Swiss-Prot record:
It is a single-pass type I membrane protein. It is found in: Cell junction, Adherens junction; Cell membrane. Disulfide bonds join C216-C270. The keyword Lipid biosynthesis does not apply. The modification Phosphoserine is found at S856. The gene is PTPRK. The lineage of its organism: Eukaryota, Metazoa, Chordata, Craniata, Vertebrata. This is Receptor-type tyrosine-protein phosphatase kappa. Pfam families: fn3, Fn3_PTPRU, I-set, MAM, Y_phosphatase. It catalyses: O-phospho-L-tyrosyl-[protein] + H2O = L-tyrosyl-[protein] + phosphate.
Length: 1439
């Protein structure tokens, strides 16, 4: 049977064996075509014999005789005699095909008879459906049934368009004896009355490998007792799996075929059998489908590090369709797990794959039905690309540090780091040394090696190392690690720096540190020995001597040396590693003058005449050089000339002959010069013997004159000459006639005296000119010396701050700079150099103006003299004793009230122009405006000229404009050509109007002036506004800047002067040299205005002269305007401000100069073993205010003790952020302080890490002060009382504050969490979005973070978030363990970054000083202070 016919089989057949009763009821029914009584033979009924069987049925007719035994029934019927045929042969009789769409009952008679009672064979009934092949019999009977007819029914249902044909088949058995007969076949057009039958059995379709279930539903009487089975077309029986009664006339039977395959595909039918017969269903087909499978593997379209793009190639398949699902199955070829994704498109992108990994990809196809998924298709084996490395090794450690090599260890570079199986690791390093020497290099290394050595490094040098991990797709650089190489022996002392200064018996040797110290110099060793001498008596073969100097002593005095002797010095430096190579120098001591015998008390005169005197000459002893000559000098005695004392004296260095002495008027002459060989032993010599000795004439002495006779010994070596002399005799005048020398040997004395006189006059004139020049140069040098010594004086002041003031008189007496090195060693050079060179330094880096005079512009009185800058600290401390009695006394000595006429200001028409009736302009110094036409009184404005430092009328002090004077104010600005306005008040203070707003926010017209605000720069303590000023009728646009200081409190004076000093410097830098006066005003134009002007003037004076004269400056200002500097508190504040400026100096560095300046700042001074950066930090510590107990009174209250982590790190009362939200009995105190940023006051809140009992207070602080950022700089550590104070997910309530975690992400060293918080006591205020930045890059045991770059990135991330939230107005909370060093460093760097953006300068000192003014423990360690500089440099280099 073909598949189509079998699938459409609609007939249900039921067969029942009846009892051998005659059919009674059937005759009453309606007959249909197909029945036959065989009276006229089978042909008449359209019955046919099968053409393909073995033999045929035989027709027995009642009208014809037959051969049958007599016991056979009478009548007409069809019969088969089995004895005539072989066993197994079959005869088939075919009924007509039935097509009616109806239910039929086929009723017939049959018998199987054998005379011997044997089995005649089998009667089968077959049904052919739609002319298909024959199936197995649907009913059969076999064996002997007797000679009586039996009746049977067959119930059949036919459904159009199907048809069926019933076939009676007689099969001969092995007995071959008997007869098989059928008769009286009736086809009824209604169901059988007693025959059970099956409903239509449907086809079953399953996928290969699944279970197939056929369900047969049977109806009829007693059907529940039937036996059931499923019969395959080939006869295989399958037992019933389950039966279920539907009702009393119907039941269902299930048949299950396990895990079918294609071989199980066939036709199946249900068979039921009871005591009355059997029932058989139609054939239903079991259809087995093969699940589909792709023929080709997927095709690769694209590849990346974490994805693969494929085309499924699922159109060509093996198996059966339709395809209802496509899936991609993939796995790592090195792994066992698989993952499957459903696909709805012809292409698919596999995401989240591992880089550089081989994957096997297959396609799965699914058809309908259970088990419809076929086997995976052929695999595509491919590999992803490499990805950029995840990071560099975190555990970069130094395994070994030597002087010239560093061994580096790092963690194993696993795939999770490299993201590629092919990668390179490079170590790059660079370093800077002195003398602008630097080196940078990169070394490739074995990736599998756990250690690498960097060689050829300089000793004791900070080497910056970083690791670079590279693969084909990218690279990752580690943060730089700075390692200092070990010390080594130092290099040689520079030859050029080695200098020796010779004396007769000592040598002063000085040198400089080796160019390559290779560490910290611990000492210098100098060995020396004599190698030759001009004095033969000096031994030169002795052993060398050795001396040692400390590291900071680069000079030495070698005493007790031999004159005229050359010494060889070998000097070498030492570190902890030992001595380096030596540097040699030869230095020769000066020769000494010969030593003459002592003539004191000895009469050397042997004989004396009127014209001669004979003396005893004794030989001298050479000292350092042999005697070159002996000389006899004759000095004429004059009555008015002081006699020389006997013994050692100034010798006569210039040899003068008798002739030259007579012609030149010299008081002495050389009578003789004797070679040393002429005086081996004492010998007499006659002075005046009229002989010549070595070119010197020894003339007879004049009898009437007295003479002193001197004996000189001279040594001379290599242009060095030393002379020793002694008076050995005196010859008195006699009464004998004067012996006139030979005229031939004389010259005209008159002519010579005249020449000498003229020369003397010329010399005197020249001397006067030189004196005038020197005096003028000294006056000009006065200012330079004052400026040059300022920094030295500042150093003394800073050092003095931590000393006791018990003996202030010794402060300068012990100044080591006041005693030179030569003085300490009793050196007396022949020509003293009185000029001193001082280091040039700046007190204030601002523009200066040249001036003619050098005197102070103020009259310094005897009772109030100017104070040296170096004495200022001592002076202020003295004045502050006894409750500042000194300041009180000084201030009260000022004249209070009106000191000059102010008639113009008092006029009625000007009264409205004065804010206060008692602070108005003096007539003599008032600013006179050019009158407006037709208004003669319009020349008045309440303003006075004030002289600056050596600049007349450099300032204009004025009141804060009132509404009536705004136009006058701008007239004054235009008339005076002022470029800067300084405003030292707020518009309203304590509810009172202090100044009318005289400027526009955009553009405003005041009379004939148009003022436009073009720029506004708000800063924490002041605002800079830039205006353009235009006047009707003038083709000119001027720029005017207003500097508005907002940091002056409503009462008193600023707590510190740092902000005001920065403000003053900014004004100085902004005021053009050619501009007119600086206009300064507060409210009245007296108190704060006076403070500003006095500080500005005194800072100029301190720089120019090294002194300050505050008292007389205030006095001078009060002569120009009434009550300038209005309170004693302001007067003291001026002193404190100038002291702070002098101590701190100018620390701002322009961006363009920062890198070079910074490297200079960190360079170690070999003399002091310190650096400028270290000194700056010490200065910062010295000027940091110390908090007293009364400053922190609220934090010290007993109820607040348990809210403080450390009782020595408390916030001052003036900086406390008091909590607003009420939380039961809890106080409004929290250990936190408000801090200014660069642009915004109180922008930072610095606090300690919340304690377990202050977590609720912390969240109250966040909400009450609108904090949109939380910066966390330490770790959660329960052992230190640092709990997790936030919810990791979901929502938690902390007192009245509800905190909900919205998201959490990580970026490098920062975990970012966004919280949404609300105040449950004030829900109408809505939510506040807060982002927490938890910084992970700062180990608890380190003073500074491990990476400059990551810390800078943190600051910039916070800054960006702040700009996005709350229109940039939200505050930032920064906390670390104690709310000090780490938090301060974050704030300081944030200020510096803003400073660079706004002003292009770097001023770390000012940033930290500003923070410490509020809380002294900001930036605690020198490492943190230097790190601020390092990050500033990192920011400049990266931007």
């Amino acid at each position: 049977m073909d598949t189509t016919a079998a699938a459409a089989l609609p007939a249900f057949v039921a067969l029942l064996l009846l009892s051998p009763w005659p059919l009674l009821g059937s005759a009453q029914g309606q007959f249909s075509a197909g029945g036959c009584t065989f009276d006229d033979g089978p042909g008449a009924c359209d019955y046919h014999q099968d053409l393909y069987d073995d033999f045929e049925w035989v027709h027995v007719s009642a009208q014809e005789p037959h051969y049958l035994p007599p016991e056979m029934p009478q009548g007409s019927y069809m019969i088969v005699d089995s004895s005539d045929h072989d066993p197994g042969e079959k005869a088939r009789l075919q009924l007509p095909t039935m097509k009616e769409n109806d239910t039929h009952c086929i009723d017939f008679s049959y018998l199987l008879y054998s005379q011997k009672g044997l089995n005649p064979g089998t009667l089968n009934i077959l049904v052919r459906v739609n002319k298909g092949p024959l199936a197995n019999p649907i009913w059969n009977v076999t064996g002997f049934t007797g000679r009586d007819w039996l009746r049977a029914e067959l119930a059949v249902s036919t459904f159009w368009p199907n048809e069926y044909q019933v076939i009676f088949e007689a099969e001969v058995s092995g007995g071959r004896s008997g007869y098989i007969a059928i008769d009286d076949i009736q086809v009824l057009s209604y169901p059988c009355d007693k025959s059970p039958h099956f409903l239509r059995l449907g086809d079953v379709e399953v996928n290969a490998g699944q279970n197939a279930t056929f369900q047969c539903i049977a109806t009829g009487r007693d059907a529940v007792h039937n036996k059931l089975w499923l019969q395959r077309r080939n006869g295989e029986d399958i037992p019933v799996a389950q039966t279920k009664n539907i009702n009393h006339r119907r039941f269902a039977a299930s048949f299950r075929l396990q895990e079918v395959t294609k071989t199980d595909q066939d036709l199946y039918r249900c068979v039921t059998q009871s005591e009355r017969g059997s029932g058989v269903s139609n054939f239903a087909q079991l259809i087995v489908r093969e699940p589909p499978r792709p023929i080709a593997p997927p095709q690769l379209l694209g590849v990346g590090p974490t994805y693969l793009l494929i085309q499924l190639n699922a159109n060509s398949i093996i198996g059966d369709g339709p395809i209802i699902l496509k899936e991609v199955e993939y796995r790592m070829t090195s792994g066992s797990w698989t993952e499957t994704h459903a696909v709805n498109a012809p292409t698919y992108k596999l995401w989240h794959l591992d880089p550089d990994t081989e994957y096997e990809i297959r396609v799965l196809l699914t058809r309908p039905g259970e088990g419809g998924t076929g086997l995976p298709g052929p695999p595509l084996i491919t590999r992803t690309k490499c990805a950029e490395p995840m990071r560099t090794p975190k555990t970069l450690k130094i395994a070994e540090i030597q002087a010239r090599r560093i061994a580096v260890d790092w963690e194993s570079l696993g795939y999770n780091i490299t993201r590629c199986h092919t990668f390179n690791v490079t170590i790059c390093y660079h370093y800077f040394r002195g003398h602008n020497e630097s080196k940078a290099d990169c070394l490739d290394m074995d990736p599998k090696a756990p250690q690498h050595v960097v060689n050829h490094l300089p000793p004791y040098t900070n080497v910056s190392l970083k690791m670079i991990l590279t693969n084909p797709e990218g690279r990752k650089e580690s943060e730089e690690t700075i390692i200092q190489t070990d010390e080594d022996v130092p290099g040689p002392v520079p030859v050029k720096s080695l200098q020796g200064t010779s004396f007769e018996n000592k040598i002063f040797l000085n040198w400089k540190e080796p160019l390559d110290p290779n560490g910290i110099i611990t000492q210098y060793e100098i060995s020396y020995s004599s190698i030759r001498s001009f004095d033969p008596a000096v031994p030169v073969a002795g052993p060398p001597q050795t001396v040692s100097n400390l590291w900071n002593s680069t000079h030495h005095v070698f005493m007790h040396l031999h004159p005229g002797t050359t010494y060889q010095f070998f000097i070498r430096a030492s570190t902890v590693k030992g001595f380096g190579p030596a540097t040699a120098i030869n230095v020769t001591t000066n020769i000494s003058a010969p030593t003459l015998p002592d003539y004191e008390g000895v009469d050397a005169s042997l004989n004396e005449t009127a014209t001669t005197i004979t003396v005893l000459l004794r030989p001298a002893q050479a000292k350092g050089a042999p005697i070159s000559a002996y000389q006899i000098v004759v000095e004429e005695l004059h009555p008015h000339r002081t006699k020389r004392e006997a013994g050692a004296m100034e010798c006569y260095q210039v040899p003068v002959t008798y002739q030259n002495a007579m012609s030149g008027g010299a008081p002495y002459y050389f009578a003789a010069e004797l070679p040393p060989g002429n005086l081996p032993e004492p010998a007499p010599f006659t002075v005046g013997d009229n002989r010549t000795y070595q070119g010197f004439w020894n003339p007879p002495l004049a009898p009437r004159k007295g003479y002193n006779i001197y004996f000189q010994a001279m040594s001379s070596v290599e242009k060095e000459t030393k002379t020793q002399c002694v008076r050995i005799a005196t010859k008195a005048a006699t009464e004998e006639p004067e012996v006139i020398p030979d005229p031939a040997k004389q010259t005209d004395r008159v002519v010579k005296i005249a020449g000498i006189s003229a020369g003397i006059l010329v010399f005197i004139l020249l001397l006067l000119v030189v004196i005038l020049i020197v005096k003028k140069s000294k006056l000009a040098k006065k200012r330079k010396d004052a400026m040059g010594n300022t920094r030295q004086e500042m150093t003394h002041m800073v050092n003095a701050m931590d000393r006791s003031y018990a003996d202030q008189s010794t402060l300068h007496a012990e100044d080591p700079l006041s005693i030179t090195f030569m003085d300490q060693h009793n050196f007396s050079p022949r020509y003293e150099n009185h000029s001193a060179t001082a280091e040039s330094s700046r007190l204030l880096d601002v523009p200066r103006y040249l001036c003619e005079g050098t005197e102070s512009p103020y009259q310094t009185g005897q009772l109030h003299p100017a104070i040296r800058v170096a004495d200022l600290l001592q002076h202020i401390n003295l004045m502050k004793t006894s409750d500042s009695y000194g300041f009180k006394e000084e201030y009260e000595s000022f004249f209070e009230g009106q000191s000059a006429s102010w008639d113009v200001a008092k006029k009625d028409q000007n009264r409205a122009k004065n804010r206060y009736g008692n602070i108005i302009a003096y007539d003599h110094s008032r600013v006179i405006l050019q009158p407006v036409e037709d208004d003669p009184s319009s020349d008045y404005i309440n303003a006075n000229y004030i002289d600056g430092y050596q600049r007349p009328s450099h300032y204009i002090a004025t009141q804060g404009p009132v509404h009536e004077t705004v136009y006058d104010f701008w007239r004054m600005i235009w008339q005076e050509q002022s470029a800067c306005i300084v405003m030292v008040t707020n518009l309203v203070e304590v509810g009172r109007v202090k100044c009318y707003k005289y400027w526009p926010d955009d553009t405003e017209v005041y009379g004939d002036f148009k003022v436009t605000c073009v720029e506004m720069e708000p800063l924490a303590e002041y605002v800079v506004r830039t205006f353009t000023l235009e006047r009707r009728g003038y083709n000119e646009i001027r720029e005017v800047k207003q500097f508005h200081f907002t940091g002056w409190p409503d009462h008193g004076v600023p707590y510190h002067a740092t902000g005001l000093l920065s403000f003053i410097r900014r004004v100085k830098l902004s005021n053009p040299p050619s501009a007119g006066p600086i206009v300064v005003h507060c409210s009245a134009g007296a108190g704060r205005t006076g403070c500003y002007i006095v500080i500005d003037i005194m800072l100029d004076m301190a720089e120019r002269e090294g002194v300050v004269d505050i008292y007389n400056c205030v006095k001078a200002l009060r002569s120009r305007r009434i009550n300038m500097v209005q309170t004693e508190e302001q007067y003291i504040f001026i002193h404190d401000a100038i002291l702070e400026a002098c101590l701190c100096g100018e620390t701002a560095i322009p961006v363009c100069e920062f890198k070079a300046a910074y490297f200079d700042m960190i360079r170690i001074d070999s003399q002091t073993n310190s650096s400028h950066l270290k000194d700056e930090f010490q200065t910062l510590n010295s000027v940091t205010p110390r908090l007293q107990a009364e400053d922190c009174s609220i934090a010290c209250l007993p109820r607040n003790h348990d809210k403080n982590r450390f009782m020595d790190m408390l916030p001052p009362d003036r900086c406390l952020p008091f909590l607003i939200t009420i939380d039961g009995e809890s106080s409004n105190y929290i250990n936190a302080a408000l801090m200014d940023s660069y642009r915004q006051p109180a922008a930072f809140i610095v606090t300690q890490y919340p304690l377990p009992n202050t977590v609720k207070d912390f969240w109250r602080l966040v909400y009450d002060y609108g904090c949109t950022s939380i910066v966390m700089l330490n770790e959660v550590d329960l052992s230190q009382g640092c709990p997790q104070y936030w919810p990791e997910e979901g929502m938690l309530r902390y007192g009245p504050i509800q905190v909900e975690c919205m998201s959490c992400s990580m970026d490098c060293d920062v975990i970012n969490r966004i919280f949404r918080i609300c105040n449950l006591t004030r829900p109408q205020e809505g939510y506040l979005m807060v982002q927490q930045f938890q910084y992970l890059g700062w180990a608890s045991h380190r003073e500074v973070p491990g990476s400059k770059r990551s810390f800078l990135k943190l600051i910039l991330q916070v800054e960006k978030w702040q700009e996005e939230c709350e229109e940039g107005e939200g505050r930032t909370i920064i906390h670390c363990l104690n709310g000090g060093g780490r938090s301060g460093m974050f704030c300081a760097i944030g200020i510096v970054v803003e400073m660079v953006k706004r002003q292009n300068v770097v001023d770390v000192f000012h940033a930290v000083k500003t923070l410490r003014n509020s809380k002294p423990n900001m930036v605690e360690a020198p490492e943190q202070y230097r790190f601020c500089y390092d990050v500033a440099l990192e920011y400049l280099e990266s931007s």
